[in-house]
Amino acid sequence: MSRRNRAPKRDILPDPKYKSQVVAKFVNHIMLSGKKSIAEKIVYGAFDKIKAKDASANEVEVFEKALESVSPMVEVKSRRVGGATYQVPVEVRPERRQTLGMRWIIDAARKRKENTMGDRLAAEILEAVEGRGAAVKKREDTHKMAEANKAFAHFRW
């Protein structure tokens, strides 16, 4: 284990278009190999497609609603007791909830069949809002796993 202090959390500057830290963090998650301008084009393009589908909706609010419907409340962590390894259900911290939600939306979007990443992302976000899609299924599977291992909750540390 490291003897150094934990690195301090860095503040994320809000993104230039929507002035939202959540969107800025999402852009950073989309980004590959430091290509932020491309990541911004993808995210903003997806948001434009969401806006085109429903003109009355605010795209950032739609995204935050999707993120909320995908973010897990509980997850399982492996805990070794004696010779056995148990899957112990633990509550997810708010920051990790957000990060996992973003990661799952992106992973699900990358596996979709649409032509561009912007199309895939928009479709996945819209499905997440409706409670469908691969990212929502991932959350349900995680919750089922935690529910199935509820008996080991007393191994929490």
UniProtKB/Swiss-Prot annotation:
It comes from Francisella tularensis subsp. holarctica (strain OSU18). Keywords: Ribonucleoprotein, Ribosomal protein, RNA-binding, rRNA-binding, tRNA-binding. Coiled coil: none annotated. Part of the 30S ribosomal subunit. Contacts proteins S9 and S11. One of its GO terms (cellular component) is small ribosomal subunit. The gene is rpsG. This is Small ribosomal subunit protein uS7. One of the primary rRNA binding proteins, it binds directly to 16S rRNA where it nucleates assembly of the head domain of the 30S subunit. Is located at the subunit interface close to the decoding center, probably blocks exit of the E-site tRNA. GO terms for molecular function: rRNA binding; structural constituent of ribosome; tRNA binding. CDD domains: uS7_Bacteria. It comes from the Bacteria. Belongs to the universal ribosomal protein uS7 family.
